[in-house]
Amino acid sequence: MFIWEKDSINKEQEDAILEDNSVLLIACPGSGKTRTLTFKIAYELSRLKSDKEFVIAITYTNRASDEIKERVELLGVDTSQLWIGTIHSFCMEWILKPYHLYSERLKNGFKVINSFDSEKILTELCKPYKEEKITYYDCGILAKTDNFYLTCLDTKKHNSLQNILGEYFAILEKNRQIDFEQILFYAYEILKSKPVVANILSNLSLISFIFSS
């Protein structure tokens, strides 16, 4: 069991570390939030009773992932059952790769298109819309649980953008590709349509954290 020095954290930090239910940490920079999360991860790792259990730490950036993992290792805790990364990486590694066969769109295989190739396709599709001054930068989308939504604030462009993005998604589907935003969308779709997958993840005792600066 991971044990820390008595004076290394305060009572509130200790309560957060020992809490078995969900914890929301709100703290200003320099208040010890990172230390608390690091100790929490180390504590949960030391409590695992099976090699089928994992502690999952989800961060906003890869840099934060590296920092947290390094801090946990410096505490002398075995990190072989720690997975840490961004939400997109988590969805790829734990949902899409092992369970993509449950998705009608992905069941025949897929690859993730990089941002350069995505921009190249969208730039080409925008060319017929020069009079409307539509460019690649207008083609931003936000994936939500039910669909994709345009981020362009100029609503006059929305109809044309819907057409452009319709063509874009058709090209990706034809080539068995998905882009960055679709990683989250299809991961959620699998979890929603196949409760057995969500149940499997739950039974692995996955514990997740959102960490920012």
For the regions a language model picked out, list residue spans one by one.
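Accessory N-terminal region flanking or inserted into the helicase ATPase core
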Residues: 1-26, 31, 35-36, 54-56, ...
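Alpha-helix C-cap/termination motif
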Residues: 19, 47-48, 75
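Walker A/P-loop NTP-binding motif
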Residues: 35-50, 67, 71
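Short, well-ordered alpha-helical packing segments
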Residues: 41-42, 69-73, 88, 184, ...
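Catalytic P-loop NTPase motifs of RecA-like helicase/translocase cores
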Residues: 44, 90-91, 208-213
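Short helix-terminating capping/connector loops at secondary-structure junctions
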Residues: 49-53, 78-80, 200-202
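Conserved P-loop NTPase-based nucleic-acid remodeling module centered on helicase motor cores
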Residues: 54, 66-139
